[in-house]
Amino acid sequence: MEEFDSEDFSTSEEDEDYVPSGGEYSEDDVNELVKEDEVDGEEQTQKTQGKKRKAQSIPARKRRQGGLSLEEEEEEDANSESEGSSSEEEDDAAEQEKGIGSEDARKKKEDELWASFLNDVGPKSKVPPSTQVKKGEETEETSSSKLLVKAEELEKPKETEKVKITKVFDFAGEEVRVTKEVDATSKEAKSFFKQNEKEKPQANVPSALPSLPAGSGLKRSSGMSSLLGKIGAKKQKMSTLEKSKLDWESFKEEEGIGEELAIHNRGKEGYIERKAFLDRVDHRQFEIERDLRLSKMKP
């Protein structure tokens, strides 16, 4: 007996429940298993009071070869999850549609308010009173009349006439006549007209001399002396430089090359441009030499 008591029955493998193979199930075994499952389900429902009961939606587990299977439960869970996700998507879409509709309504309200504001304010600012319109028309008329007067004044100088002036010069005992076209309002034309007016009464003096009486010998002698002095008066002399310039101007007018020469002189190869360049070079050289002298003079 002592030997029998000393044996460890808790670790023995012989007391384990016998599990038959898949092909050895009997009807009694199946019924007992179903009853055990029902008892276990009732105990679990009593322990989990106040929670959601999922046992009603879950069917009785079936026995198959190799153990229990829960395929139906997994399918139902997947269906319930898909239904929940679809319902959530529908809710989100409905909320988005509501948000879009609310934004459109808000924009319409803002547009209506802005249009009403413009209707209230716009016409008053745009429509000026009749007095202001009249004043504006009067100012426009006065300004337009002033502009016309100014335009006429500007056009008047353009219509000035040109006058030909003939001057007589003495060059080496020869009489040289120079004819130029000058504006009638120029100083040269005015001086020429004044000289002609002075010469006219003096030219009429010889015709009045024979009518003088015999006792006026003094006056006759003075008149004759003045006339002889004017006749023998020396003409304005012309220098060689002025004569050559006059000949060159007349040659350009005859040949018609005045414009061509002016364009050529304005170019880089013209005499005037080259002379200006050389003058600039000389001036620059002078400045450099001056700076050197000043730098040497400083202590």
Curated annotation (Swiss-Prot):
Pfam families: BCNT (PF07572). Ubiquitous. There is a cross-link at K150 (Glycyl lysine isopeptide (Lys-Gly) (interchain with G-Cter in SUMO2)). Residues 49-65 have a biased composition (Basic residues). It is found in: Chromosome, Centromere, Kinetochore. The keyword Zinc does not apply. The keyword Ubl conjugation applies. Residues 1-18, 25-43, 70-94 have a biased composition (Acidic residues). Residues 178-217 are annotated as: Hydrophilic. Residues 95-112, 192-201 have a biased composition (Basic and acidic residues). The modification Phosphoserine is found at S82, S85, S86, S116, S216, S250. Its main location: nucleus. GO terms for cellular component: kinetochore; Swr1 complex. It comes from the Eukaryota. The modification N6-methyllysine is found at K219. Phosphorylated by CK2 (casein kinase II) in vitro. One of its GO terms (biological process) is fibroblast apoptotic process. Residues 218-299 form the BCNT-C domain. Residues 1-156, 192-224 are annotated as: Disordered. Keywords: Centromere, Chromosome, Developmental protein, Isopeptide bond, Kinetochore, Methylation, Phosphoprotein, Ubl conjugation. May play a role during embryogenesis. PANTHER family: CRANIOFACIAL DEVELOPMENT PROTEIN 1. This is Craniofacial development protein 1. The gene is CFDP1.
